[in-house]
C-alpha cells in the first residue's frame, strides 16, 4: 500500500451533534484528553477555575460558556488520526452547524440520558440524512438519574428513524452508577467517581459470569446478568454495513463529565467509522485516492487572532495532498494562488501545515476573496456541491447610531454574511438593511462583533418579515415581470442573489400560487 493511501486510510473526520447542554463541549474536551491533545480538561460552565474549555475560544463564548463558532481539532488516537469538528451547541447556532456537517464523514450524536431525544438533535439529524452520514450514539450523564435505557433506545429508533445496536450497557445510574458491560468484548468496565480531569485506569472484569463481578458490585451483578438477556433479545445486533449506510447506530453509555465511556466511543469510531469518502461535484465524483489536490470551503471565520484582523477559510480536503507552497486554482475566480501558510488547528492555537491529506481540514488566510462553497483544485474546473445556505427564520432591521458609518456597516455585514454568521438583505426599493438569522443569539453576536471588529455601533428594530426564499426562473421575461410586480418584496442578499422577503407565510403561499414559473427556494447552493 502506498504511503499516500496509508495516510488517507488513517483519517477519521467527524462532528459532534447534540441539543444544547447535552454535554457536547465536555465530551469534546474529554475526547481531546484521550487524544493527548490536552493533559487536563477544562470545565465548561461557571468557569471560576479560569480553565476555559479549550474549544470555546472567541470572547463571547468565553463569557457565556457556549461554543458559538465551529472549531477544528486534530489529534492521534490508536493507529488513526482524528479530525474533530466541534459544532455550535447553543440552540441559536444552526446554520454554521448545518454546513459543518457537509465536511465530515461521520457524526457522534450525544444525548442527555435524563431527557432523551430533543428538538435540536432532531433538526441536525435531518441534515445528516441529506448525505446518509453514519452516526455513533453516546448516552451521556450516567452519573445522574436517567430514564430507562431501553426506553431511550426505543425513542431514538422511533423519533430519529434509525436502528440502535447497544455496544455498552449501563450498570446502575446516578449515585449508584457502577460501570458498563461491553457486549462485544464480554467484559465489565468499572466506574470510579471523581476522576473527571484525568484518564481513568479502569478496572476491567472479563465475562459476566465471573465471580469477581459479584465481589466488585454486589447485587448489581445478578441484575445485569438478567437484564442482558432481555437487552440482547430486544435490540439489534451491530451490523457494519447498515452503520455505513446511516441505517443503524452503535450506542454507548457513559458520563463525559466523569470521563467514563469516552474511550469506548473513540475505539468504535477508529474501528468502524468510514475513512475519507468520495465527494460529488457538478460534473463527476472525486475519489480520495486521486493524486491531484481538491477541496471545498465550508466555513469562514473572522478574526481568529484578536491581534490580527484576519479571516480564515476552513477547507475540507477531498483528494490529493496539500504541501506548503503549492499552487492551487481558485475555481470561482479562475485564478491560481500560491499557498505557503495554510493552518492546522487545535481550537484557536494555529500551526502551519506542512502536509495535509483527504479528510483533513486546513485554514487558508482570506482577505475577502474566498466565499463559503468555493472549490480549490490543481487546475480542473470542478465545483463541489452540497454546501448550502439555509433560509433564515428570524429578521431584524439594522440601523446605525452614527449615520456617517454606513460604509463600515455594510462592509462588516457583508463580511459576516460571507463567513455564515448571519445573512444580510438589501431591499430593492429602500435603503434598509435587513439581517436574517436562524436564532436570536446570532443577532447579539453580530452587533457585538460589529462593535469590536468594525468600530460600528448598530441597533436593531423589529420588522414584519416572516421568511425569505431565493428566487430563480429560467425565463427572463417572466422573471422581469415578477421583479416589476413584486419589487416591494424583493431584496439582494450578501452575494447579490435575488431573494423574496415575505411579510407572512400566507403572502409567500399566495405569491407561489400566482407565479408558478418562479422557483422559491429554501436553500441556496453556495
Swiss-Prot record:
UniProt protein name? Peptide chain release factor 3
Show the SUPFAM superfamilies listed in the entry.
EF-G C-terminal domain-like, P-loop containing nucleoside triphosphate hydrolases, Translation proteins
Functional summary from the UniProt entry? Increases the formation of ribosomal termination complexes and stimulates activities of RF-1 and RF-2. It binds guanine nucleotides and has strong preference for UGA stop codons. It may interact directly with the ribosome. The stimulation of RF-1 and RF-2 is significantly reduced by GTP and GDP, but not by GMP.
Give the matching NCBIfam families: prfC (TIGR00503), PRK00741.1 (NF001964), small_GTP (TIGR00231)
Which HAMAP family does this one have? Answer: Rel_fac_3
Residues that hold GTP according to the record: 18-25, 86-90, 140-143
- The residue range of the signal peptide is none
Question: Where, per UniProt, does this protein localize?
Answer: Cytoplasm
The UniProt entry lists the main location of this chain as cytoplasm
Tell me yes or no: is Ribosomal protein among this UniProt entry's keywords. no
The record's annotation in Gene3D superfamilies points to:
P-loop containing nucleotide triphosphate hydrolases, Peptide chain release factor 3, domain III
Mind telling me which CDD domains this protein's record contains? RF3 (cd04169), RF3_II (cd03689), RF3_III (cd16259)
For this UniProt entry, what's an example GO CC term?
cytosol
